[in-house]
């Protein structure tokens, strides 16, 4: 069972639809008992980092997520991926979950590329990662973001190029993060979700 975490700032149903399409058992919940009993967790997220962290705290989920991430696989998606890091500088400075070392900062792409970075972009593999077993260099996935992770290369399974090297898929222990939306990324994204479900 994969539990999709419901804290008020996630694109829950598109993720659930993708898992349902794959035949993966899942639920959407904010209940601590469901999070504890789940085999794996997905932390979706849309919007602003400070608001999302506040909602996660107010839902009483911050500490249980940190604890469960030591025991089971966790995937953060888009803003949910950014929340895995130590802190973000979006609208000031806000502490994150601290599950992957690094920060989240406004992108400064070269060549006057506009932000937000919206659309399809190709993945460039970096460090070995189980989630990329079905993915080839150059496969395209779908992005929507203005901020990006700043972290050691050893934590980056794949980058994309958007006038700068953008960490697209990050990892640390049981914790994985997709800056892109796997649930909106066609065959490539579904393959990543299927592999995550089978970990």
Please report, for each region that a protein language model flagged, where it lies by residue.
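Short, surface-exposed beta-strand/loop micro-motifs that present aromatic residues
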Residues: 165-171
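N-terminal beta1-alpha1 ligand-phosphate binding loop
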Residues: 2-24, 180-185
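Acyltransferase
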Residues: 178-199
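Cysteine-nucleophile active-site neighborhood
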Residues: 49-117
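Short, Asp-centered acidic motifs that coordinate Mg2+ and/or phosphate
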Residues: 40
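Pocket-forming structural segment of enzyme catalytic cores
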Residues: 86-164
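Conserved beta-strand elements of the Class I
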Residues: 1-5, 75, 142
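Short acidic low-complexity segments
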Residues: 26-37
